[in-house]
Swiss-Prot record:
One of its GO terms (cellular component) is cytoplasm. Encoded by a cluster of genes that have evolved by duplication from LHB. HCG-beta is encoded by six non-allelic genes (CGB) clustered on chromosome 19q13.3 and named CGB1, CGB2, CGB3, CGB5, CGB7 and CGB8. Two specific hCGb proteins that differ by three amino acids in positions 2,4 and 117 have been described: type 1 (CGB7) and type 2 (CGB3, CGB5, CGB8). The CGB gene first arose in the common ancestor of the anthropoid primates. The keyword Disulfide bond applies. Residues 129-163 are annotated as: Disordered. It is found in: Secreted. GO terms for biological process: G protein-coupled receptor signaling pathway. This is Choriogonadotropin subunit beta variant 2. It comes from Homo sapiens. SUPFAM superfamilies: Cystine-knot cytokines (SSF57501). Belongs to the glycoprotein hormones subunit beta family. Its main location: secreted. Expressed in placenta, testis and pituitary.
Length: 163
């Protein structure tokens, strides 16, 4: 009887410790550097902003073939504001203003492709799409740590559900 009680105490304390200090950072705004370019403008620059990133708890069924899949949540924008910058050197007739999102708060929710990169493989890390800027090792090539904002899926408000 005492072994069962000891096991119960150890398991309950372990759960308490895990809930106080999550193993992975939760969904929250983090600082990020994004590449900004526009078709027709001969420049690619980087901007500092905040994006939503982090862990969202999810579950999966053990018997996936028998029961329907559970919806999976991802780290999404809750509150966002947009800021604009003017790209230098754009030719006459090309609007040099580009807007980008700044995450104010985040939430774990179903992935909405209209506002969120729902994952998947990326061709390139955070780089400019124009090949003139990709081969350069100048400051125009941003660090290879984040996906390019131009690689986001097309707008749609349909949530991504597991197959």
């Amino acid at each position: 009887m005492s072994k069962g009680l000891l096991l119960l105490l150890l398991l309950s304390m372990g759960g308490t410790w895990a809930s106080k200090e999550p193993l992975r950072p939760r969904c929250r705004p983090i600082n990020a550097t994004l590449a900004v370019e526009k078709e027709g403008c001969p420049v690619c620059i980087t901007v500092n902003t905040t994006i939503c990133a982090g862990y969202c708890p999810t579950m999966t069924r053990v018997l996936q073939g028998v029961l329907p899949a559970l919806p999976q949540v991802v780290c999404n924008y809750r509150d966002v504001r947009f800021e604009s910058i003017r790209l230098p050197g754009c030719p006459r007739g090309v609007n040099p203003v580009v807007s980008y999102a700044v995450a104010l708060s985040c939430q774990c929710a179903l992935c909405r492709r209209s506002t969120t990169d729902c994952g998947g493989p990326k061709d390139h890390p955070l780089t400019c799409d124009d090949p003139r800027f990709q081969a350069s090792s100048s400051s125009k090539a941003p660090p290879p740590s984040l996906p390019s904002p131009s690689r986001l899926p097309g707008p749609s408000d349909t949530p991504i559900l597991p197959q």
